């Protein structure tokens, strides 16, 4: 068949088209525009059958193709050396973007992120000085808008951290299980607005404690374990009643996972998951977070219940206890400085592993980026990929929105 293409050279001879012309009669498919062009200026494209093309190639009438590319020249002065006798050259699998993408072992997507959000009772969104780009969000408006932005780029999981008024804090943290407290109210609001949003909650007393510790403090400064766990169970049940999908005990009290599982099941919340802070270290990387919630301990530190940063094998003990007590997800905190612990849990547990890229990690990247010492966006994405490579299935990160926008091709 033939079709007309306008503006062809008038001297074109269709009979010389690669030496081929279909023996059958041809058709000229003319458009109204082509009809106005003189026949002598039309190009007739003649197509032969596959067998005719093959016969032409066999006869030596090979269609033209681009020539072999010359080898790129080396810089002047480059020594001429014999090729190394290498059986394997790993660089061959890295020589092009397509090959690098094909052989990439670790991937990351917005679905891997859990977005930590700070909330407070006010209407204004208050910037957090030590965490550029993060705010204490008004629970009724700012929070809803931030969640909408995250969902637009594929982040559909959030974890809530409340700033509680000092007047509501107490030594026993009773506000933690107030069914009409800030967190339960916020959960109900978000579930009403976004029913499919996955809401994680923090289970610990430090935001509600007048002492700033994760548990009840005895007069001699000892953090009371079992009494604290009793309070945490009531807190988790209140969160589940409001609609929480995953409760996350970050307190590091012994036995709290099993107690929470029993309390939730007894109230009919068998479907609510537990993400245990399995290996939460007594780290110096938490400073900006405590500023955000005004939850610094009023005295002492948290070393009697959080793990020693020098310890590795202890994480296995915590992991086995949490598994046996019914944890659904195991979390390591902090993240990047503890990649070895993430890998340790990944290699020894079939459960999903979470990593928390904490406030100090976030602040360092932001500060260095602001000073133009690093490419903030590239370092941020590399740090998240490293957490995934180490074995984290999900990552709690304050960069969730920014990183998801990068993955979606949006500008910051």
UniProtKB/Swiss-Prot annotation:
<feature type="binding site">
    <location>
        <position position="359"/>
    </location>
    <ligand>
        <name>5-aminolevulinate 2</name>
    </ligand>
</feature>
<keyword id="KW-0627">Porphyrin biosynthesis</keyword>
<feature type="transit peptide" description="Chloroplast">
    <location>
        <begin position="1"/>
        <end position="48"/>
    </location>
</feature>
<keyword id="KW-0456">Lyase</keyword>
<keyword id="KW-0934">Plastid</keyword>
<protein>
    <recommendedName>
        <fullName>Delta-aminolevulinic acid dehydratase, chloroplastic</fullName>
        <ecNumber>4.2.1.24</ecNumber>
    </recommendedName>
</protein>
<dbReference type="GO" id="GO:0006782">
    <property type="term" value="P:protoporphyrinogen IX biosynthetic process"/>
</dbReference>
<dbReference type="InterPro" id="IPR030656">
    <property type="entry name" value="ALAD_AS"/>
</dbReference>
<dbReference type="Pfam" id="PF00490">
    <property type="entry name" value="ALAD"/>
</dbReference>
<feature type="compositionally biased region" description="Basic residues">
    <location>
        <begin position="86"/>
        <end position="97"/>
    </location>
</feature>
<dbReference type="GO" id="GO:0004655">
    <property type="term" value="F:porphobilinogen synthase activity"/>
</dbReference>
<comment type="function">
    <text>Catalyzes an early step in the biosynthesis of tetrapyrroles. Binds two molecules of 5-aminolevulinate per subunit, each at a distinct site, and catalyzes their condensation to form porphobilinogen.</text>
</comment>
<dbReference type="GO" id="GO:0009507">
    <property type="term" value="C:chloroplast"/>
</dbReference>
<keyword id="KW-0350">Heme biosynthesis</keyword>
<keyword id="KW-0809">Transit peptide</keyword>
<dbReference type="GO" id="GO:0006783">
    <property type="term" value="P:heme biosynthetic process"/>
</dbReference>
<feature type="region of interest" description="Disordered">
    <location>
        <begin position="68"/>
        <end position="101"/>
    </location>
</feature>
<comment type="similarity">
    <text>Belongs to the ALAD family.</text>
</comment>
<keyword id="KW-0021">Allosteric enzyme</keyword>
<dbReference type="InterPro" id="IPR013785">
    <property type="entry name" value="Aldolase_TIM"/>
</dbReference>
<dbReference type="GO" id="GO:0015995">
    <property type="term" value="P:chlorophyll biosynthetic process"/>
</dbReference>
<dbReference type="GO" id="GO:0005829">
    <property type="term" value="C:cytosol"/>
</dbReference>
<keyword id="KW-0150">Chloroplast</keyword>
<dbReference type="GO" id="GO:0008270">
    <property type="term" value="F:zinc ion binding"/>
</dbReference>
<comment type="pathway">
    <text>Porphyrin-containing compound metabolism; protoporphyrin-IX biosynthesis; coproporphyrinogen-III from 5-aminolevulinate: step 1/4.</text>
</comment>
<feature type="binding site">
    <location>
        <position position="398"/>
    </location>
    <ligand>
        <name>5-aminolevulinate 2</name>
    </ligand>
</feature>
<keyword id="KW-0460">Magnesium</keyword>
<dbReference type="InterPro" id="IPR001731">
    <property type="entry name" value="ALAD"/>
</dbReference>
<comment type="subunit">
    <text>Homooctamer.</text>
</comment>
<feature type="binding site">
    <location>
        <position position="318"/>
    </location>
    <ligand>
        <name>Mg(2+)</name>
    </ligand>
</feature>
<feature type="binding site">
    <location>
        <position position="302"/>
    </location>
    <ligand>
        <name>5-aminolevulinate 1</name>
    </ligand>
</feature>
<feature type="active site" description="Schiff-base intermediate with substrate">
    <location>
        <position position="280"/>
    </location>
</feature>
<keyword id="KW-0149">Chlorophyll biosynthesis</keyword>
<comment type="function">
    <text>Is committed to plant tetrapyrrole synthesis.</text>
</comment>
<keyword id="KW-0479">Metal-binding</keyword>
<feature type="binding site">
    <location>
        <position position="290"/>
    </location>
    <ligand>
        <name>5-aminolevulinate 1</name>
    </ligand>
</feature>
<feature type="active site" description="Schiff-base intermediate with substrate">
    <location>
        <position position="333"/>
    </location>
</feature>
């Amino acid at each position: 068949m033939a079709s007309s293409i306008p503006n062809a050279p008038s001297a074109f001879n269709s009979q010389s088209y690669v030496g081929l012309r279909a023996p059958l009669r041809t058709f000229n498919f003319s458009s109204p525009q082509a009809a106005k062009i003189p026949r002598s200026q039309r190009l007739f494209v003649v197509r032969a059958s596959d067998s005719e093309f093959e016969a032409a190639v066999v006869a030596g009438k090979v269609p033209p193709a681009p020539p072999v590319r010359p080898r790129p020249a080396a810089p002047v002065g480059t020594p001429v050396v014999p090729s190394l006798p290498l059986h394997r050259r790993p660089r061959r699998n890295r020589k092009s973007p397509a090959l690098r993408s094909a052989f990439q072992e670790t991937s990351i997507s917005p679905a891997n992120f859990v977005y930590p959000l700070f909330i407070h009772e006010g209407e204004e969104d208050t910037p957090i000085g030590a965490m550029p780009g993060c705010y204490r969000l008004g629970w009724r408006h700012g929070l809803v808008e931030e969640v909408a932005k995250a969902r637009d780029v594929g982040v559909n999981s959030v974890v809530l951290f409340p700033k509680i008024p000092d007047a509501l804090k107490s030594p026993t943290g009773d506000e933690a299980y107030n069914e009409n407290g800030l967190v339960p109210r916020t959960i109900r609001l978000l579930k009403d607005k976004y029913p499919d949003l996955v809401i994680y909650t923090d289970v610990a007393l430090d935001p509600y404690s007048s002492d700033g510790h994760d548990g009840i403090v005895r007069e001699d400064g000892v953090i009371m374990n079992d009494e604290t766990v009793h309070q945490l169970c009531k807190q988790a049940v209140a969160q589940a009643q409001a609609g929480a999908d995953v409760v996350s005990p970050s307190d590091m009290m012994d036995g709290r996972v099993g107690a929470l599982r029993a309390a939730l099941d007894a109230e009919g919340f068998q479907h609510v998951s537990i993400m245990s802070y399995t290996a939460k270290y007594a780290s110096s990387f938490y400073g900006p977070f405590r500023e955000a919630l005004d939850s610094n301990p009023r005295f002492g530190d948290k070393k009697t219940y959080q793990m020693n940063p020098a310890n590795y094998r202890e994480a296995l003990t915590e992991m086995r206890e949490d598994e046996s007590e019914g944890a659904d997800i195991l979390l390591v905190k902090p993240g990047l400085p503890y990649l070895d612990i993430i890998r340790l849990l990944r290699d020894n547990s079939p459960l999903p592993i979470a990593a928390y890229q904490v406030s100090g990690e976030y602040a360092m990247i932001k500060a260095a980026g602001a000073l133009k010492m690093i490419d903030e966006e590239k370092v941020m994405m590399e740090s998240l990929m490293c957490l995934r490579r180490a074995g984290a299935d999900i990552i709690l990160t304050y960069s969730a929105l920014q990183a998801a926008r990068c993955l979606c091709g949006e500008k910051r």
